[in-house]
Structures are given as C-alpha cells and as structure tokens.
C-alpha cells in the first residue's frame, strides 16, 4: 500500500494510492473523515492508529484512491469552510473519476458525513455515515444520494436513534437509505464496517452521472475566480 502525507492550505492529509497506480487512469475516490480521537496537528498519529488503514491492508485489491484529512480544530464543524474547500479541491484532481466520489466517516466524522452530503449532495455518488447523526429536518437534500449507515445497538456515546431518524427521514422523502445495526456493538461500529468488503462493493455500484458538469464549474471557479 503506497501512502503519502500531504498538505493543502492548513489541512494535512493522507493519500492512499490503489495498487499498481497509473497516472494515466482515473480512479474512484473515497474520502474518509475520522472521529474526535484523531484531532490535532500530528498526522503520524492518524497513520499509526487508523483503524481504517489497518482494515484496508487486509484486502488483496482496493481500487479506490483514498484521502483522509486531519481535523486540526475541535470538530470538523469548526473548520467547515476549509473542509468543504478541501473536498472540492480533492475531487478535481486529474486522476479522480468525478462520477465515483464517496464519503465515509465515523462518530464525529459520521456527523460530518451526513452534513457534508446535505450541504453538497451533488458531489457524492454514495455515502457511508458510521455512528453519527445529523439535521434530520434537512433530510430532503439527501433524496438523490444513496446511503448506507451503520451503528452499534449498545452505543451510549452516540445513540442509535441518531442514525435511525436520519435514515427514516431520508426514506420518507423517497430517498435510498439503509441502516445496519450491530446488535452487540457499543460505540465502535467502524471496525466491523471498514473490514466488510460488501461496503466497498456497494459504494462502487453507485455513480453520480451529473458530477462532471459540477466539476467543470468548480474547475472554472478555481481557474478564473
């Protein structure tokens, strides 16, 4: 697994390249947002302790370009404009297939995953929020975004109802959301999710066919201001 540490403006981030990476090819992009335990300025902690990276190494083939930004503030929401700008910039990388951009996050990152998709539903082909929750009154904005949420039934940090109500509201509006509850899991529902190959197969089954038009607009904004 080829991993590099980079920085965009104030945000440090990890890039994981797919096996046999070819600069002439375009790859699906998986953006992964960590929980509160990963906050700070030391990106090496995220490298050493990332449950996602440890689980990712178990796969013989992992076709995604993966980007993992580091939250340098108290929460993702305290650097929301920075994070949004970072994600838009990442999506416009030349090796990214803009129709296959996916967002995943756990705990604090799960909340941010819900909110980022509600704020920018046109950017993502599908999302995977894990043990998070969100502003359910804005769920209509997710009606065209496929969602697979995960939560532990015994989670007393973020109650399962947080995921349940989001999924219910999205589906009430005619959306495509599903929820997996791990009956014996407490707050850590991410290890089981990260290690499940069906999650990545499900992500790749979704495409955002309107994304290229959106990316052209963002590229023009970057170029001309």
Give the residues covered by each predicted segment.
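A domain-start/cap signature at the N-terminus of enzymes
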Residues: 1-29, 64-65, 106, 111, ...
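Active-site machinery of serine-nucleophile hydrolases
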Residues: 29, 33-83
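Alpha-helical scaffolding within the catalytic cores
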Residues: 45-58, 85, 131-139, 161, ...
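Primarily recognizes the serine-hydrolase "nucleophile elbow" in alpha/beta-hydrolase
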Residues: 88-93, 99-143
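Acidic catalytic loop of the alpha/beta-hydrolase fold
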Residues: 154-159, 188-189
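Catalytic histidine-centered segment of alpha/beta-hydrolase-like enzymes
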Residues: 185-193
